[in-house]
Amino acid sequence: MKQYKAYLIDLDGTMYMGTDEIDGAKQFIDYLNVKGIPHLYVTNNSTKTPEQVTEKLREMHIDAKPEEVVTSALATADYISEQSPGASVYMLGGSGLNTALTEAGLVIKNDEHVDYVVIGLDEQVTYEKIAIATLGVRNGATFISTNPDVSIPKERGFLPGNGAITSVVSVSTGVSPQFIGKPEPIIMVKALEILGLDKSEVAMVGDLYDTDIMSGINVGMDTIHVQTGVSTLEDVQNKNVPPTYSFKDLNEAIAELEK
């Protein structure tokens, strides 16, 4: 297995499953830290701040710092502020997205006359919120969605994800949004900028082919699939572009790196 200078690492299905740590996750991060190999946690979750993500990882005894976390909310805020500094935004979403947009100097407004409409996962979504978003897009606002995940795993089962909420606005307006999170290259390019490394020097680690592995493939990066989450070994082997590597878990990846 190739020795990479850094790793981009998915969270749910790779580091943990719900509230349970996945075997090998802590060991992999400890291995990287001992070797002095940089890594970033790259997540499509827009509802949490980096501090909240870090807290969850630390509760599982997985070492993490807020500056090592790249959320779809942060990538979205960065994307908009680079295009239109100080722009006005109508948003659906949680505290993670609100904080990211505000800290980027963007102005959050609660009406349809805005520069951008941004859809993030909103667990308190209402018809009125969707109505305002729809009117905003119809009024000419640039339509952004933090991530395309149509379903998310919860204790009760798979529940509607941000892609499902986004699709309501998209179908109503006939306008397709710009997605920011995995598998789009935007969040990956942001992570590479933070690392200061070329894509050839970095590998993407994740469990879900359609988001994690495709995010690496779409940006031309090597990919490491772990069979600890959604996509099975059979799933990824049958794809037109399989991952560079596939391991039972991250313990197996460590064993390969140590050869």
Curated annotation (Swiss-Prot):
Protein name, as recorded: Acid sugar phosphatase
One term under GO cellular component: cytoplasm
From the UniProt record, which GO molecular function terms apply? Answer: metal ion binding; phosphatase activity
- PANTHER family assigned: 4-NITROPHENYLPHOSPHATASE-RELATED, HALOACID DEHALOGENASE-LIKE HYDROLASE DOMAIN-CONTAINING PROTEIN 2
Top-rank taxon: Bacteria
Q: What protein family is recorded?
A: Belongs to the HAD-like hydrolase superfamily. NagD family.
- EC number(s) of the enzyme? 3.1.3.-
What is this protein for, i.e. what is its function?
A: Catalyzes the dephosphorylation of 2-6 carbon acid sugars in vitro.
As cofactor, the record names: Mg(2+)
- The parts of the chain that form a coiled coil are none
Entry keywords, A to Z? Hydrolase, Magnesium, Metal-binding
Recorded hits in Gene3D superfamilies, A to Z, give: HAD superfamily/HAD-like
